[in-house]
From Swiss-Prot:
The name this protein goes by in its record: NADH-ubiquinone oxidoreductase chain 5
Gene name of the record: ND5
Family assignment from sequence similarity: Belongs to the complex I subunit 5 family.
Gene Ontology molecular function, alphabetical: NADH dehydrogenase (ubiquinone) activity
Reactions catalysed, as given in the entry: a ubiquinone + NADH + 5 H(+)(in) = a ubiquinol + NAD(+) + 4 H(+)(out)
Source species of the chain: Cryphonectria parasitica (Chestnut blight fungus)
Recorded topology in the membrane: Multi-pass membrane protein
Keywords of this entry: Electron transport, Membrane, Mitochondrion, Mitochondrion inner membrane, NAD, Respiratory chain, Translocase, Transmembrane, Transmembrane helix, Transport, Ubiquinone
Membrane-spanning parts: 5-23, 30-52, 81-103, 112-129, 133-155, 168-190, 200-222, 243-262, 272-294, 301-320, 324-346, 367-389, 409-431, 452-471, 514-536, 607-629, 634-653
């Protein structure tokens, strides 16, 4: 059963990719969807068996690297963390496969698309189930390559190619530091196997663990789109919408958070790394929510909300609340996939227009999509008793429950981020469904709900967005829950704050984020509905124009990267090419050698004078040289050759 979870998606990918021409579009769709759905059912069984019965499973297939003390086994482990990660990955992957049957129906390259989707799922399973850092890195690189292939799926579009290259190169920065971290683990601990590394971690110097932890955090920053290495995330929206749902809801962007959770027995011994995670997540949350508020593309707004929620997960990791981070990761995957697929349904209905300022009044034409996006947005805003409520607010409470300066500061910053998150959710719903129609008459007239393949995944995700958090809260975060007794998530006793969070935080600070989000949402709707001129006039003022431009241009971070990093590197590269490659190297190498030989040959030809006495002199000099060579045989051959060349040149010089 456990090997089937790993093998089935790659079998579907191979069949659809290599034999898609023989199978046809429908055959490729049936095979890939069947493989992923069966894998999902098996993963649910594994979740029950491993999680509830506390029976972790390890499978060692074969020895991959065997070099004296360095041994890597191609092995997989299924513990409570692994099966919990497989749950959203495979459920959402199977729903995206079904959704894509309708969404990509008019595309001529269906087989290739479904092959890429299944391959992406397989690589994510490898990343999650690998029992050592090297095997995890195989999956890590695999999802990077698959995201490149999927984002640039419509390869004739320049924007898609640019976005895929941006995502690929930005992730290479994180991969570089992750590789350095793995080398540091190998140097300090002598192995990359999780069990060995985590059992030796308490005996290692804290400074070494800090260096390793910082490298792992930078690796996670790129993959999980934390501020600084986040620039690829909104650009990746150029791919098909099912790809956006798969990459940015449950799979690739959560890989960095998974890496930090898996490394919890390591980073728990470095308070510096935990503090970095705490502040990094808080800054990411407020940064992304501010930028998302000023975006006009419906998919980019949802992408920035993903970034904001990932920031909250990293905050939870910084608080050592790994179970809350995992719970929020799983919850977020469902309602974020619902938002992305709902956005895809809207885009499909309005002739592929993504600017939601040109929507308006779609509630009458897309009632099901409106209901699902409303449910998912309320869950995103942590509305009471929906899925997001049980994890998002608990992260904010945990920050306050640490009762430190950093904890309380992060609570305040994250609350501001949560307020802005709710504001742009309200903005999307209002401008898309409730405002007066702003699109063309033909677009509105032809707006319609999709078929069963388009709507069934949305309904299933909406059900998860309502009930999943309530049904599983005691499993993941309940006091005394035995779900993580296998130590897949390790919390140092010094960092245990769950009881303080539950019983020590005043009730007013628990409900404060919800009160603020509701008040600001009502204020935003009232301003837009009854005083629309005030917002418009503010935007036209000089201050409002500059403010809007600053946030709309994403804090000018990309401009800074282009002007001061990319251009600097390109200038340095061109100067290196000019001075070294085309300068010194060519002067010494091909050009210099050619000129030297040409000059030498010209000097030799000038010795041919046609005068007999000159030839007699050459013969005499040759005899003398031969005698000198015989008597000075102890001198090195290179010195002799040098003497001969100098003699010839001196003769030539005297001749001239």
């Amino acid at each position: 059963m456990y090997l089937s979870i790993i093998i089935l998606p790659v079998l579907g990918s191979i069949v659809a990719g290599f034999f898609g021409r023989k199978l046809g579009v429908r055959g490729a769709q049936i095979i890939t969807c069947s493989c992923v759905i069966v894998t999902t059912i098996l993963a649910l069984l594994a979740w029950v068996e491993v999680g509830f019965n506390n029976i972790p499973v390890t499978i060692n297939l074969f020895r991959w690297i065997d070099s004296e003390w360095f041994n890597i086994i191609w092995g997989f482990q299924f513990d409570s963390l692994t099966v919990s990660m497989l749950l959203p990955v495979l459920i959402i992957s199977s729903l995206v496969h079904i959704y894509s049957i309708s969404y990509m129906s008019g595309d001529p390259h269906n087989q290739r698309f479904f092959s890429y989707l299944s391959l992406f799922t397989f690589m994510m399973i490898i990343l999650v189930t690998g029992n050592n850092y090297l095997l995890m890195f195989v999956g890590w690189e695999g999802v990077g390559v698959c995201s490149y292939l999927l984002v640039s799926f419509w390869f004739t579009r320049i924007a898609a190619n640019q976005s895929s290259i941006s995502a690929f190169l930005t992730n290479r920065v994180g991969d570089c530091f992750l590789t350095i971290g793995m080398f540091a683990i190998l140097w300090s601990l002598g192995n990359l196997d999780y069990a060995t590394v985590f059992s030796l971690a308490p005996y290692i110097n804290e400074n070494i663990i800090t260096i390793i932890g910082i490298c792992l955090v930078i690796g996670a920053m790129a993959k999980s789109s934390q501020v600084g290495l986040h620039v690829w995330l909104p650009m990746a929206m150029e791919g098909p919408t099912p790809v956006s749902a798969l990459i940015h809801a449950a799979t690739m962007v959560t890989a960095g958070v998974y890496l930090l959770m898996r490394s919890s027995p390591l980073i728990e011994y470095s308070s510096t790394v935990l503090l970095i995670c705490l502040w990094l997540g808080a800054i990411t949350t407020v940064f992304s929510s501010l930028v998302g508020l000023f975006q006009q593309d419906i998919k980019k707004v949802i992408a920035y909300s993903t970034m904001s929620q990932l920031g909250l997960m990293v905050v939870a990791i910084g608080l050592s609340s790994y179970n809350i981070a995992l719970f929020h990761l799983v919850n977020h995957a469902f309602y974020k996939a619902a938002l992305f697929l709902g956005a895809g349904s809207i885009i499909h209905a309005v002739a592929d227009n993504q600017d939601f300022r040109k929507y308006g009044g779609l509630r009458e034409f897309l009632p099901l999509t409106y209901s699902i996006i409303l449910i998912a947005s309320l869950s995103l805003a942590a509305f009471p008793f929906l899925t997001g409520f049980y994890s998002k607010d608990l992260i904010l409470e945990s920050a306050f429950g640490q009762f430190t300066f950093s904890g309380v500061s992060v609570y305040a910053i994250s609350t501001i981020g949560a307020i802005f998150t709710t504001l742009y959710s309200v903005k999307v719903i209002y401008l898309t469904f409730l405002a007066n129609p702003n699109g063309s008459l033909m677009t509105v007239r032809h707006a319609h709900e999709g078929d069963i393949f388009l709507t069934l995944p949305l309904v299933i995700l909406a059900i998860f967005s309502i009930f999943f958090g309530y049904l599983t809260k005691d499993i993941f975060i309940g006091l005394g829950s035995s779900f993580f007794v296998d130590n897949s998530l390790y919390v140092h006793p010094v960092h245990e704050i769950l009881i303080d969070t539950e019983f020590g935080v005043p009730t007013v600070f628990k409900i404060l984020p919800f009160i603020f989000t509701v008040l600001f949402s009502i204020l935003a709707i009232l301003l837009s509905e009854f005083i629309p001129g005030s917002v418009f006039n503010f935007k036209l003022s000089r201050f409002g124009y500059n403010l809007f431009g600053f946030f709309n241009q994403r804090f000018l971070i990309e401009m800074f990267y282009n002007n001061y990093i990319t251009n600097l590197v390109l200038t340095l590269g061109s100067q290196t090419t000019k001075v070294l490659d085309k300068g010194s190297v060519e002067l010494i190498g091909p050009f210099g050698l050619e000129k030297g030989l040409m000059n030498f040959s010209k000097s030799l030809t000038k010795l041919s004078t046609g005068v007999v006495t000159s030839y007699a002199l050459y013969i005499l000099l040759g005899l003398i040289s031969f005698i000198i060579i015989l008597y000075l045989s102890q001198i090195s051959s290179s010195l002799i050759v040098l003497l001969i060349i100098l003699t010839l040149f001196s003769l030539n010089f005297n001749k001239q």
